[in-house]
Amino acid sequence: MYDYIKGTLVKITAKHIVIETNGLGYIVTVANPYSFSDQMNQTIQVYLHQVIRDDAHLLFGFHTEDEKEVFLKLISVSGIGPTTALAIVAVDDNQGLVAAIDNSDIKYLMKFPKIGKKTAQQMVLDLAGKFAELPAETTNTTANQTAGNQQLDEAMEALLALGYKATELKKVKAFFEDTNETAEQYIKSALKMLMK
């Protein structure tokens, strides 16, 4: 098991980042890869959770230990795998998630990708009261301003990778067409819109 990895960020894609350390490039799947854009070619530290399957060894990465803790609590729920948990963690703060679980707000929980009624009910059953020690925000990142449309396209790719449907994202993309934000900012704003 790994706690974290520290190395040079050498690549960013819609689904993962690549961190090079000691001559090896590690593929680390993260909730919002573009939140690392301002750290390209710099030394970074990412908290890890390793998933070992018959056909693959996967690394899931997080900005903070709190973000990792939310992820671990989510994958403890029957019906929630690492990819779905990562999509939930991608929402900028966990206030809505915690409130929905503590208030048994099944409709809110069903707004997350791949979460149906049965899984939402299981989340409430398994996680009620277990997030009390976590802060309201799980991430603390910034990014540099770059060309808007390319950044918007990258954000939409990342949201597709998290499991959102193209039909949902078409409306969101149209809303942001005339704006100039970073991919990270687009993702945060889009997630807030999708959760309403």
Swiss-Prot record:
Indicate where this protein resides in the cell: Cytoplasm
A GO CC term assigned to this protein in UniProt:
Holliday junction resolvase complex
Asked if the keyword Cytoplasm belongs to this entry, the reply reads yes
Which biological process annotations from GO are given for this protein? DNA recombination; DNA repair
> What Gene Ontology molecular-function terms does this entry list?
ATP binding; four-way junction DNA binding; four-way junction helicase activity
From the UniProt entry, list the residue stretches annotated as the region Domain I.
Answer: 1-63
Q: Which domain of life is it from?
A: Bacteria
User: Which keywords does the record carry?
Assistant: Cytoplasm, DNA damage, DNA recombination, DNA repair, DNA-binding
Where are the residues of the annotated region Flexible linker? 143-146
Q: Which InterPro entries match?
A: DNA_helicase_Holl-junc_RuvA_I, Hlx-hairpin-Hlx_DNA-bd_motif, NA-bd_OB-fold, RuvA, RuvA_2-like, RuvA_C, RuvA_C_sf
User: What is the annotated signal peptide range for this record?
Assistant: none
Nucleotide-binding found in the keyword field: no
Pfam families to which the protein is assigned, alphabetical: HHH_5, RuvA_C, RuvA_N
- Report residue spans for region: Domain II: 64-142
What coarse category fits the chief subcellular location reported for this protein? cytoplasm
Region Domain III, as annotated, extends over 147-196
Q: What does this protein do?
A: The RuvA-RuvB-RuvC complex processes Holliday junction (HJ) DNA during genetic recombination and DNA repair, while the RuvA-RuvB complex plays an important role in the rescue of blocked DNA replication forks via replication fork reversal (RFR). RuvA specifically binds to HJ cruciform DNA, conferring on it an open structure. The RuvB hexamer acts as an ATP-dependent pump, pulling dsDNA into and through the RuvAB complex. HJ branch migration allows RuvC to scan DNA until it finds its consensus sequence, where it cleaves and resolves the cruciform DNA.
Subunit-level organization = Homotetramer. Forms an RuvA(8)-RuvB(12)-Holliday junction (HJ) complex. HJ DNA is sandwiched between 2 RuvA tetramers; dsDNA enters through RuvA and exits via RuvB. An RuvB hexamer assembles on each DNA strand where it exits the tetramer. Each RuvB hexamer is contacted by two RuvA subunits (via domain III) on 2 adjacent RuvB subunits; this complex drives branch migration. In the full resolvosome a probable DNA-RuvA(4)-RuvB(12)-RuvC(2) complex forms which resolves the HJ.
Family the UniProt entry places it in: Belongs to the RuvA family.
- Domain comment quoted from the record: Has three domains with a flexible linker between the domains II and III and assumes an 'L' shape. Domain III is highly mobile and contacts RuvB.
| Official protein name in the record | Holliday junction branch migration complex subunit RuvA
Q: Which organism is it from?
A: Streptococcus thermophilus (strain ATCC BAA-491 / LMD-9)
Q: What gene does the UniProt entry assign to this protein?
A: ruvA
